[in-house]
Amino acid sequence: MTTPTFEEYSAQVRAKGCDEVLVREWAAGHQTPVHEHPFDAYGLVVRGEFTLTCGDTQRVVKTGETFELKRGIAHSEAYGPEGATFWVGRAS
């Protein structure tokens, strides 16, 4: 599968109801505490990888892979040795 451009990805997630699309960059080894968001999130990792933990479930999300998080879901993130960059659409 070919990685879409930022504009193509933005159009895809806006079609799912996203109001905004952001570029998020995280440093190598960065970790977030458990938190939740007041929006649905649709992301595409474009560089690096991170581990997404929701309860007892962990998933490593790598370059070229997508993830979805529904609003109000408690989760944490741990970024790999290269850090990560992802594009994320937010649906309020």
Where are these regions (language model features)?
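Short, conserved beta-strand element in jelly-roll/cupin
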Residues: 36-52
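Ligand-binding loop in jelly-roll beta-barrel domains
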Residues: 71-92
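Conserved short histidine dyad/triad with adjacent acidic residue
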Residues: 20-37, 71-72
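Short acidic-glycine-tyrosine-enriched beta hairpin
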Residues: 55-72
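A generic beta-sheet turn/junction motif
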Residues: 27, 38, 54-56, 79-81
